[in-house]
A protein has these predicted regions:
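Mid-domain catalytic core of redox enzymes
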Residues: 32, 247-356, 363-374, 386-387, ...
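Dinucleotide-binding Rossmann-like beta1-alpha1 core, especially the glycine-rich loop
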Residues: 55-143
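Active-site/ligand-binding neighborhood in enzyme catalytic cores
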Residues: 114, 131-251, 255-258
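N-terminal Rossmann-like FAD-binding beta1-loop-alpha1 element of flavoenzymes
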Residues: 11-38
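Glycine-rich FAD pyrophosphate-binding loop
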Residues: 30-54
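Hydrophobic anchor at the start of a short beta-strand
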Residues: 13, 34-36, 272, 394-397
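Conserved flavin/dinucleotide-binding core of flavoenzymes
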Residues: 3-4, 107-109, 319-322, 336-464
Length: 464
């Protein structure tokens, strides 16, 4: 919906940003019986979640899955009546790591790529004998006594050795977040590993004690219409007129209530939830609290690009038996990773065809996205062809640029967020949510959006 003017009544809550966190917050607030409006600067809701569908192809331009271990997304699907449409990844669910030009499977019995059983370590062809010996010695490595944040590279190198940094932490742990392994915070992104060391003195020993076993359904699920189906269903579940698109907020002010100026008109609300990137939050808050604005704008962001390519099956010689691969920086390629989409999910390509996605840029290679569209497409296409034995040109290509859409939880991020929360207490009724602060990934964004909605609802109800 677009609007040239907004109702001049005072709403309970105004939400700025219709990404998944903002939509989840709106859904929760509507369920509580509060009046809500969501202002979205672009022409559609969903943020980085978007799915393109044509001629039997289904292409997620952003995230393509929901992590089952974090139940917020699956729970929301259940509430929306689409849980029965959730589909697991296809078998086999093998993921690969590129080393010296060859793809090596991550062995069964691994957690986040780390072999936690002796069998997994022995079976792995990814590591040298020296690397395996160093990783096996993790159980003998003393725990850290200093209680302060450190980078993923520092933590993994200290406990598992350099090969684990280069071939697991860099492409997998940092790659998930499009970041630089030397800068990203282990405590902010993988607190479970930090807690394992603290409690047991050994990550491997702690994970073995938990008896981590893969779910028969796999770690991830999606929907037949891609992750965009979740956004479509969630948006439709809100009352007509709740989402106002092409409504870029230009000013936020507070007196007895909050006044929000946007390109769609003026909105007044008792409470405001900012569900936009941290740097946008900062720009909106600068006239109100410049210190808070500085804190928000200090959250670094990376830009990424996704290149999708469609082929006939007979053009690809690689068996594509698995979900895809990641590329360590030591390999010297532009690609960060590749997904074998049609092998990972059912119904993503017409029969006899293959859909692939390649990823470029991120905190590891920030200047890559200075290249033009055709150069990015050609780079991804050529590297995929070399790795997977592809002949001929793709039937089509798509490029999706995500400029400053990947927040980087660098060392010290948790302290910054705590400081932001303290400053927000000076602005009663104003709350922040989304991936820039406490939530990486769809389930966490949904959970944080709904938790923030509950806080906004409590504020409004206490003043009713």
């Amino acid at each position: 919906m677009n609007a040239s003017a907004l109702d001049d009544s005072v709403l309970d809550v105004a939400i700025v940003g219709a990404g998944i966190a903002g939509l989840a917050a709106a859904f929760d607030l509507r369920a509580r019986g509060l009046t809500v409006c969501v202002l979205e600067a672009t022409a559609r809701p969903g943020g980085v979640i978007a799915t393109e569908r044509f001629d039997g192809w289904t292409i997620d331009s952003g995230p393509d899955s929901l992590l089952v271990q974090k139940p917020a997304a699956v729970t929301l699907c259940r509430e929306l009546g689409i849980a029965d449409r959730l589909v697991p990844t296809l078998m086999p669910r093998t993921a690969y790591v590129l080393r010296e030009g060859r793809l090596h499977a991550i062995a069964e019995g691994s957690f986040l790529g780390f072999p936690i059983t002796l069998g997994a370590l022995v079976r792995s062809r990814l590591f040298s004998l020296a690397g395996k010996a160093r990783m096996a010695g993790e159980v003998l490595t003393p725990r850290r006594t200093v209680d302060e944040d450190e980078s993923i590279a520092s933590f993994v190198g200290r406990r598992f050795g350099r090969e684990a940094v280069d071939y697991l932490a860099d492409p997998l742990l940092a790659g998930i977040h499009a970041g630089d392994v030397d800068r990203l915070s282990i405590r902010a992104l993988f607190p479970r590993l930090v807690d394992a060391e603290r409690r047991s003195g050994s990550v491997i020993r702690a994970l073995r004690a938990l008896h981590v076993r893969p779910s028969p359904q796999g770690a991830f699920v999606s929907l037949p219409g891609g992750t965009g189906e979740l956004v479509d269903t969630l948006s439709a579940a809100l009352a007509p007129g709740t989402i106002v698109t092409n409504a870029r907020v230009t000013r936020l002010a507070r007196s007895d209530v909050y006044a929000i100026d946007s390109t769609a008109g003026l909105l007044r609300a008792r409470s405001v939830v900012l569900a936009v990137p941290a740097y946008v939050t900062g720009s909106l808050l600068r006239p109100v609290d410049s210190t808070l604005a500085d804190l928000c704008e200090a959250v670094p962001y990376a830009s990424t690009a996704t290149v999708a390519c469609g082929y006939r099956h007979d053009q690809v010689s690689h068996p594509l038996s698995g979900t895809g691969f990641v590329v360590p920086r030591t390999e010297g390629l532009a690609l960060l990773a590749g997904t074998w989409v049609s092998s990972k999910w059912p119904g993503r390509a017409p029969n006899g065809h293959v859909l692939l996605r390649g990823y470029l840029g991120g905190g590891r290679d920030p200047r890559r996205l200075e290249a033009g569209d055709q150069e990015l497409i050609s780079t991804a296409q050529q590297e995929l062809a070399e790795l997977l034995g592809i002949s001929g040109s793709p039937l089509f290509t798509r490029l999706y640029r995500w400029t400053r859409q990947s927040p980087q939880y660098e060392v010290g991020h948790l302290q910054r967020v705590a400081h932001i929360e303290r400053r927000l207490t000076n602005l009663p009724g104003l709350f922040v949510t989304g991936s820039g602060f406490r939530a990486i990934g769809i389930p966490d964004c949904i959970s944080d959006g709904r938790t923030t909605a509950a806080r906004a609802a409590d504020y409004v109800m206490q003043r009713s």
